[in-house]
Every structure is written in structure tokens, then in C-alpha cells.
Amino acid sequence: MPSMGIDLGTTYSCVGVCNEKGRIEIIANDQGNRTTPSYVSFNNRECLIGDDAMNQVAMNPVNTIFDVKRLFGRKYSDSVVQSDMKLWPFKVIANKFDDKPLIQVDFKGETKTFSPEEISSMVLSKMKEIVEQHLGEPVTDAVITVPAYFNDRQRHATKYAGTISNLNVLRIINEPTATAIAYGLHRRGIDDMKVLIIDLGGGTFDVSLFNIEDGIYEILLSGGDNHLGGADFNNRLMNHFIDEFKLKHKKDITNNQRAIFRLRTACERAKRTLSISSLASIEIDSLYDGIDFYSTITRTHFEKLCSDLFHSCIDHVETILNKCKLDKSLVDEIVLAGGSTQIPKIQRMFKEYFNGKEFNNSINPDEVVAYGAAVQSGVISGKGSNFPQLIFLNVTPLSMGIETVGGIMTNLVERNTHIPIKKTQTFSTQYDNQTNVLIQIYEGERTMTKDNNLIGTFELNGIPPAPRGVTQIEVCFDVDIDGILTVSAEDKTTKKVQKITISNINDHLSKVEIEKMIVDGEKFKQQDQQQKKELIESNYKIYCGDENTLDFEITQKLLGSAQSTEMNE
């Protein structure tokens, strides 16, 4: 059976298929387009997906959903969600139990709510249908791509969306990795190179630096922003024209959903026009209160409106190179992916930054991610025998560990560790006759857990009473190939095990937040180490005084009971 690779994009999605002979093909939809809008629309009769949904959005804006990927892994109360909602015509509400965002629509005469994952599953089902109609046979095996900086919760959301769309999700891979796979196939025989992948799509920006040597693609570092892309450029245009309309006609259109979406469509069209022309027109009959709206914008003005966003892209690239201590002149290849990399100003800025270096444009940037994902699907499902052997070494963006004595962060997996990886460490109980242990899991670069991000907790119960330091608890961190973390704790005496797959991170960490955690980790390193030393000395005195306040880490250090093992899979 063939397998497929799906680039589930914020604004457009693309699907490629790997047939039984290992041949890769990007599949066009029933409109003849090789990319499909990530739109879903509900009406009194049916649910429309893709081009059909987008084409009727002006008539049904409040029930047409798009940009849903921006809601993955976020809370309704998130300031980013609140900001996006102002320019969305559809209604987003909070789940009263967990503050997760839900989309509310009218469907067949009833009010319905859908999770972001459910909406995305409909888009995935459409991509599956496109492949099956083209091949004339069922296809269920799929590799789905995500931005490199998607956290564990967002990866779970993507995998869940695939599962409920009746896909067998072979793997979740990073978009830059998929791009690198496609690049590797088109440049067979390359070796010992530094390759920079720049992926600027509709809603996210990823940049990854790869070292290619002996067929091994090692990610040296990844960066980017999960909330930077073509949709943000559209929003800048929209806000500009909303202000212009208000200035000319003394009327605010922001509360009229139909007007907002008609303007959004016109702005998207103008943005595309400005990639090939120096001037674009906005012409919307009866936009609001019977007022026709006609205006123009130059490419120069558009570039000024988005100047800070464009420069942010350069800043992310510079950060990656600085952290890797690599001079930009030593980058051998620059590969562009994502439709927004075709904006002339973006290309010009990157070319100037890299002193005129030409980009690698061997694959269509709108299709390269799906192409690489399709290759990976073929390799996993055993149809990739004609592909060169490519080994990819992905890394963790942040350190992960548990809280120990006095709120100290004990890392089991360090930042930039290659995955998949499994690490175990043995700890001891804190109190005499302790019968349960609370495991608190954090990510971040600070010494104290209060300065890091809590991503999960669970409890190991039923521990037989014993003097403190006697009972051995083995904690295991297992990060799989998809970057998803599972943590387990085992009582070595009873063999009782509790585990949790971390899919309930309290807050989505943006690239800015992750970078801040890394910078703070370096900035406060000396101060944190001194605080840790004082805590250890304090707890040592308490231990000698026979007071029952020792925690895992101190107990295992003082009693010499710590064991650590590592297994790269």
C-alpha cells in the first residue's frame, strides 16, 4: 500500500505520496491545485473543506474556520489567542473545564463546538481523500510535519488530529527535517556541508542548521517563531486599511465579520500581487454600510508596515549562527521553504545578510515539506529502498528534569540532546516510612524549578514503609523520535510503575519564551549555582541532625545511591 507525507500548514496544506516503487509525487486536488487551503466551512447542508470552503467564505464568514493551527497547544486566555481573535470572523470560546479554545459554529441549524484538533482532522481527511481519489485505492499510512519549535503538547495535538481522521500516523517530523530530506535526495553525494533551512510559511517561521557528513544529517540547532508568517503580514495590511477606512469614512468595520473577511481576502491578494508588482489595488464594493472601498498600496509601504517582522527573521538566523559559533560565510547551502520566502524583501534581506549568496531553489518551496515527508513515509513503510540512507539526528530545544530538594532542578535530558533518547536515574525517598512520591517535571535552563516551566506531575503510591534513603525509585525520561516525552517512576522493591506521557503543558512556549529561558539560564548560572550549593550544604547539616527533610537529589548524593544510565535508540 502507498504511504503519504502531509504538510499540515496554517493557511495551505500539501500532500505527497510514495508509491510501491518508491516514487514520490505531489498530488493535485480536484481543482487542479497542488496546495489546498486549510479552511473548513459549515452551513445548513454540509461541511466544506479546502477550496470549496475558502471560495464561499465571504457569504459565510462566521462559520468558516482557518488559521486553526495557531490554536494548537494554547489556552483561550493566552494573549496571542486573544489578539488573533480580533481579526477572525469565527467565534472562539473557552472550554470551562480547562481553558482550552473551542470553535463555535452553526451547523445544520444547531450550535456546535469543535476543538482545533477536530478542525485540523477534517483538513487531514481532505488530504487523504485527495490521494485516494488520485490513486483509486485506500491510503492510511502518513507522516505529518510540524514546526521545529512545536512543543510536546502541540505535537500530541497534531498526532491526535491524524488519529481521528483515520490515519495511521507513522511519525511526526519537523518541517525543516522534511525539507532537508527533500534537499538530500536532490543533492545526492553531498558530504561535509553546513546547510541552513529557512522555512517561512503562513503562520510559523523555522530555521535549522544542519551538518551533513557521511549520510548523517545532524541538526546543530533549531530556532524560529511559532507565530510569525504570512498571516501576520496579512494582518499588518488589514490593520492599515481598517485605519484608512476609519480615517476616510469615520466608521469602524472591526465588528462586522463579513467586512473583515472580505478585507482579509483582498489583503491576501494584494500581498501576492506585491511579490510581482510594485503596486497593488484594493477594490471592495459595498464593504460597510454601502460604502465602496478603493485604495492602493506600494511594495515599499508594505515592506515598511512589516519591517520589524522581516527583521525578526534575520535576527532568528543570526541567533542560530551565533549559538553555533559559525560565521555566516561558512554556510554552504541555504534552502528556502514556505510560500512567504517568495516575498522579494525577505529574499533581498537574506541575500544581503549572506553577502549575495544564492539560494538553493531546486524544489518548489510550497511543496518541499510534503515531498520530504512523503520520502520519510516511504522509508518507514519499507518502500524507500531506492532512497539513499539518510540518518537524522534531531535535538531537544530545552533541558528536562524533575524537582529535587529545595526546588532544585535535576536534569535528566539536557538541551540539544539528540533524540530519540532514554535516560534513567535512581533516587531515594525523603522521609522515614514514606509511602508515596510526587514527581514534578520541568523544562528550562535555570537551576531552580521556580524559574522553569512545569510540564507535568504524577504520583507513585503504595511504597512499602522503610527508613529514608532505603527505598530506591528509578525515574526514566523517554523522548521518542517524534520529540514526545514519557516519564515513568518505578519502585525497585515492589516493581510498581507509574508513568505519564507529557501532553498537558500548562502554557505553550513561543520561540521568544524558549530563547529567554536559555538566555536567563546563562545569565543567572553563577547565581543559581551558588544558591544550589547553599541548599546542599544546608540539607547536609539537616541530614546530620537527623531531621526528616531530605529530598531525592540530596539523599542520593549523600548516601551514594544514584545511578544513571543513558540509551540512545
From Swiss-Prot:
Recorded hits in InterPro entries, A to Z, give: ATPase_NBD, Heat_shock_70_CS, HSP70_peptide-bd_sf, Hsp_70_fam
Report the PROSITE patterns cross-referenced here: HSP70_1, HSP70_2, HSP70_3
Provide the GO biological process annotations. Answer: chaperone cofactor-dependent protein refolding; protein refolding
Is the keyword Mitochondrion in the record?
no
Per UniProt, which keywords does this protein have?
ATP-binding, Chaperone, Nucleotide-binding
Nucleus: present as a keyword of the record?
no
Annotated GO molecular function terms are: ATP binding; ATP hydrolysis activity; ATP-dependent protein folding chaperone; heat shock protein binding; protein folding chaperone
Q: Would you say which domain of life the source belongs to?
A: Eukaryota
One GO CC annotation, please?
A: cytoplasm
Which PANTHER family does the record match to this protein? HEAT SHOCK PROTEIN 70KDA (PTHR19375)
The record describes the protein's role as: May function in protein folding and assembly, and disassembly of protein complexes.
What does the similarity note say? Belongs to the heat shock protein 70 family.
This chain's protein is named Heat shock cognate 70 kDa protein 4
Q: What is the lineage of its organism?
A: Eukaryota, Amoebozoa, Evosea, Eumycetozoa, Dictyostelia
